[in-house]
Amino acid sequence: MDPFEGRMTFLQLLGKLNASQFSQIKPAQFAIKHLDLEEDLYSCIWEELESGSFNTRVNIMYFVDTLCEMCLKNGLTGGYLNMISRDICKLVQNVAPIGAAGAANAPEVRKVLQSLHEKKVIDDNQYKDAMATVEAHEQASKSGDTSTSGAISKNDILKRIEEDRERHKRMRENIWAISEPELEAEIAWNTTQGITESDLESLKDEYEKFNECLHATS
């Protein structure tokens, strides 16, 4: 795939981003599949970010988290991960600018920053700097400095409410998801011997003792 075709396809996928997991995964898979175009595709993220609404920007922020997660799962280092960690403060400035839109996005930006920090995509200093940027913009918004922000439309607000519901639903589902067994537990399970005749005799003795205690108290 040539760079022009890759950019057009990727921009279309980014334009369809919303709170659903599918809309986040599809462009991430495309980006990973076409690593030879990673710089071109990364520039598309910024194009969409700088031209989109405040809802689009927060969806881009969540997409960045999804892309990093999929890179790590596929054993990919450098590339997208390095570019994202390098530009993390610039990313925050665009998603949570000073003003009403930035203030509305600030809580979501914090969640993504925490996730990226836990994944070690950004280091401690980058995390602190990015969080400080969010805090500074949020405080400036509360003080009334909204000169750099636009108004939020009613449709944008309604869309955000709907997408927040979808995100919270996914969070609840993830809480109940059963994670893969840890290596230590898996080793213990695989090395444990089966039940022997001696084990069965011991269980039988314990059961008889339990019944005796039960009858003694009745």
Curated annotation (Swiss-Prot):
Just give the chief location class. Answer: cytoplasm
A GO term, aspect molecular function: calcium ion binding
User: Which spans does this entry mark as compositional bias, Polar residues?
Assistant: 141-152
Source domain of life is Eukaryota
- Cellular component annotations (GO), alphabetically ordered: CTDK-1 complex; cytosol; nucleus
Q: Where in the cell is it found?
A: Cytoplasm; Nucleus
Looking up InterPro entries in the UniProt record yields:
CID_dom, Ctk3, Ctk3_C, Ctk3_N, ENTH_VHS
Q: Where is this region: Disordered?
A: 137-157
Q: Which residues form the CID domain?
A: 2-138
The record's keywords, sorted A to Z, are: Cytoplasm, mRNA processing, Nucleus, Transcription
GO biological process, alphabetically ordered: mRNA processing; positive regulation of DNA-templated transcription, elongation; positive regulation of transcription by RNA polymerase I; positive regulation of transcription by RNA polymerase II; positive regulation of transcription elongation by RNA polymerase II
The entry assigns this protein to a family as follows: Belongs to the CTK3 family.
Q: What does this protein do?
A: Subunit of the CTDK-I complex, which hyperphosphorylates the C-terminal heptapeptide repeat domain (CTD) of the largest RNA polymerase II subunit. As part of the CTDK-I complex, involved in RNA polymerase II transcriptional elongation and pre-mRNA 3'-end processing. Together with ctk2, required for ctk1/lsk1 CTD kinase activation.
Task: Relate the assembly described in the record.
Answer: CTDK-I consists of three subunits, ctk1/lsk1, ctk2/lsc1 and ctk3 (also called alpha, beta and gamma).
Q: What is this protein called?
A: CTD kinase subunit gamma
Source species of the chain: Schizosaccharomyces pombe (strain 972 / ATCC 24843) (Fission yeast)
